[in-house]
Amino acid sequence: MPLTHELCEQAALEAFNDKWFRRNYLAMAEKYGGVTRAELQTAARVADMGPRLEVVHGIALEMEQRIDDLLDGSANDLDLDPVHTFPRIDGISMKLRQLSDCCPLHQCFGHLAYLGLRPLLRARLLPYQFASIPKKGQTALKRQVERWLRRKSLGIQHALKLDVKGAYEHTKQELVLAILQYEIPLAAWLLAVVRCLLAMSPNGGLLIGGYLEAWMFNLVASYILVRILGYVKTRRGVSVPLVVRSGSYMDDLVLMGRRWADIQSAARKITKWVKDTLHLTIKNSWVRVDFLSPAEEHRRRHLKGAAKGCPGLDMARYVMHRTYTTVRPGIFKRARRQYMRAGADLKRSHFIPLYRSYRLISYNGYFKGTKSRAAAEALNQQKLFKSAKWAVRAAAIKERSLAV
């Protein structure tokens, strides 16, 4: 794909989406577009896109100039601000992760690289790959696994979840660049931009929080899934796949099939191939799931306590069973805690604080898409959810009136 001014403008627009009034983005808009915060606010009140388009035009010109300097040898890199990394503890798994904060211009170049790579990504990424990408999030994974489990012709009886150790951190930049060099050897400007962006990582791997990096790891994961689905065994002259279906969510892989021995064989093979070829490590802590039949799950519905539970695939914050889906216990505990506190707030002061309203809205999807009607009724979830939406709407109206 050739580098054009329109492509740079589209990348800048996507990078600035919902971020126009952040402090660092406003500084960048004034530096390269010559438009102040007051002018942007005035234009936003009357739905005038002129100042924003002026900013995007100025940023696109700067991006083109930096890429031209990079290609003709006048510069060694894109002259971006260093990436700021900071530790954060995952509230669910309690793992310590090194997240990254990239400057606005870094994000613009990341979106530009994605737009250039989009034809390749559309061709290479499998329909069963899910991550923090548009229309391919955790809800999409939940629906896909539900369709697999409830489709009788597939005959899925077992599942195995694998986890790539330190996926982003241990995915070397040389591996990603080698794949791109093989796939698009003639895209000189695109390879140069991707090389400079990947080199910004302080540890030699992929950044957690970068826009381009999420797509690059999914490109690497596509080779893993293709390899898994290609494993077959030959019986009486007929090739039978070892794995019926396979998918991924971020650094988690799931293998589903009819026989546990076949899935186990495929897992051993892919672990060795990933280690030897991609220099990544799949953890030895496999998670095996043996699904029950629909009749057995229906029979257990009438039992009490732990006897009522059925084995399920815990992935992407959901637990998928044969005939129903539940929420991961840790997520449900956090959601229940917030709804109980919101109920106390509503009873005490007749309104829900804004910060808690955002949390209630974010947890609504877990109640909506799972078998949790009894819990939702006990927590009065729908009433609290509507009250939270009203609080957010009222805060937005108040903020808009103050801006005028």
Predicted regions and their residues:
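Active-site and adjacent loop segments of nucleotide-processing enzymes
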Residues: K304-V404
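Non-catalytic, polymerase-adjacent accessory regions of viral genome-replication enzymes
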Residues: M1-L70, E399, A403-V404
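Generic alpha-helical secondary structure
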Residues: V56, A60, H106, G110, ...
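Active-site-proximal segment of RNA-dependent polymerases
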Residues: G110-K172
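Conserved polymerase palm-domain catalytic core
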Residues: R147-M250, V254-K275, C310-G312, I352-R359, ...
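Short, conserved non-catalytic motifs in the polymerase core
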Residues: A44-G50, D81-C108, R124-K136, L198-L219
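Polymerase palm active-site segment centered on the conserved acidic dipeptide of motif C
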Residues: R245-S248, L255-S349
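An acidic intrinsically disordered interaction segment
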Residues: L61-F86, L180-L190
